[in-house]
Amino acid sequence: MTHDPLLNARRTGYTRDGFAARYHAHRPKPPSALLELLLQLAGTRRPQLVVDLGSGTGISTAVWAPHAERVVGIEPLDEMRAMAEAGDAPPNVSFRAGVAQRTGIPDGAADIVTCAQSLHHTEPAGTLAEIGRILRDGGVFAAYDYDWPPIVHWDANRAFDAFMDGVRALRMKHGIRREQEQWEKDEHIERMHRSGIFRHVTELSLHNVERCTAERLVGFACTISLVLPVLDLGLSDAELGLTALRETAERTLGAEGLPWYVTYRVRAAVK
């Protein structure tokens, strides 16, 4: 069957009412060190164009505003893109409807292309070919994903793991299967090597520190695609395991929250 990138994007479950706002409120931002690294690899302090594929609500797009002449986010889902456009992004940041395999960006126009927590949702051969087309010679592509949950407190993280175990059990009990086609993140680097598009491919880890409250940890849990179908079962928070997660997070993180250590796995390549 022919791969339909827009249909595949919709199967994430990210089109649910209220999801985009929850995602935007609780997901972490990329670390400043990542931007510095990509600027260094691209050999420029101020790129003419940065393209963010699968830009979602714009978290990973707007961070480039102070660093680039122009930033374009490509996002297939209207609901996520509407949240991005409703924000206070500067005038040099814009968002377009599109998929990673068909961006509408001119040949060789981009200095930097990023996929933040999104490459595993896209068919890789067509996506990498499009990235190769829109990148200039010497331009840089980076796919980066964070480990979840980020580390905040051992007991809160243990409660998060228990919640996810419960989610998997509920999926099995109710016969919920993943509809969306996905590609393993651990295989990104090998696919980038095999594409023949890039002169140099490397992999590293970076981290960021943000603030995590109980509300944020629970909200983050409710933005994970594996969790979303379980939330539709009509179960109580106690039956879902959210009550136990919330109570542990409130007890361990306190009213002000604690530092949240977010590890990013970065796969970067130079064309």
Describe each model-derived feature in a short phrase.
Residues 57-102:
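Class I SAM-dependent methyltransferase SAM/SAH-binding core
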Residues 122-131:
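A short, conserved alpha-helix within the catalytic core of class I
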Residues 117-118:
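Short catalytic micro-motifs in class I SAM-dependent methyltransferases
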Residues 1-54:
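Conserved class I S-adenosyl-L-methionine
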Residues 125, 183-271:
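Conserved Class I S-adenosyl-L-methionine
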Residues 103-112:
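A short acidic, Gly/Pro-enriched loop at the edge of an enzyme's catalytic core
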